[in-house]
């Protein structure tokens, strides 16, 4: 099966990998709309995605810069050409989000000042690491996940029924463009020749992006209930002066630790191991 996919092209390989996690992405995204206050949930979603739209062009430029540093690399020229086109296509998308937030009565500047969520920070930071440490072609895996399943017409109509036409520019414009962008990525991959390492890296980039997207949707679906639960778990958080974003991270770490055996009592001073 793997040999058949590779023979069909790198685009087909990546499509098959993304298909493995698409059901989880769809379920996670649909949970957000179960919120008893769906308009507020939509505003949280736009605010959470705002850092992604702001980061898109700088990230694409970083990948293109890495391509231009290695003109002898046979992947550099076609990849740099794609990135140049995509930079033009992605410009101004953050303004769509700002306009939609304003139409919902939310201050766009508040979204700009807010720290990005842990899920978004991890998603974007991972791409910089993969581009710098592996190859800029890895960014195609991330973009493929984000742009190969555009907002459905059902979702757009649902938001319009809840909030009117005003705050739907982000969804409607991405619905019109993202399917085409996704097809362009898979077509480009079909023209590229990747070795086993880069094929795995592109797949890793895509699957890690999906993992972070599911985490983001879960954060949004939990909403304020999550914050209340965290406050109960960590009653000293107010004394420590933690913000909501910091509190979410501490609670996540504590929850992860709670699922592990208590080995510290048996290991004495055999702890640590981090370094820079």
Whereabouts are the PLM-identified features?
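Non-heme di-metal
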Residues: 2-276
């Amino acid at each position: 099966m793997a040999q058949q996919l590779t023979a069909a092209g790198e685009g087909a390989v990546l499509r098959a990998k993304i298909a493995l996690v698409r059901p989880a992405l769809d379920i996670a995204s649909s949970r957000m709309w179960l919120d008893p206050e769906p308009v507020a949930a939509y505003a949280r979603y736009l605010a959470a995605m705002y850092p992604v739209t702001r980061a898109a062009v700088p990230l694409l430029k970083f990948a293109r810069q890495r391509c231009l540093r290695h003109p002898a690399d046979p992947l550099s020229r076609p990849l740099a050409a794609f990135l140049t086109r995509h930079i033009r296509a992605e410009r101004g998308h953050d303004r769509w989000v700002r306009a939609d937030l304003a139409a919902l009565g939310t201050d766009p500047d508040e979204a700009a000042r807010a720290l990005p969520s842990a899920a978004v920070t991890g998603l974007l930071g991972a791409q910089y690491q993969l581009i710098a440490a592996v190859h800029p072609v890895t960014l195609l895996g991330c973009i493929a996940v984000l742009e190969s399943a555009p907002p459905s017409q059902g979702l757009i109509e649902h938001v319009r029924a809840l909030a009117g036409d005003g705050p739907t520019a982000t969804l409607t414009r991405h619905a019109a463009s993202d399917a085409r962008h996704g097809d362009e990525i898979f077509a480009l991959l079909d023209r590229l020749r990747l070795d086993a390492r880069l094929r795995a890296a592109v797949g890793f980039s895509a699957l890690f992006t999906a993992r972070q997207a599911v985490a983001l949707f879960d954060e949004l679906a939990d909403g304020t209930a999550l914050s209340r639960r965290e406050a109960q778990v960590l009653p000293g958080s107010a004394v420590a002066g933690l913000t909501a974003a910091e509190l979410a991270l501490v609670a996540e770490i504590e929850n992860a630790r709670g699922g592990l055996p208590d080995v510290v009592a048996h290991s004495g001073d055999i702890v640590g191991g981090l370094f820079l």
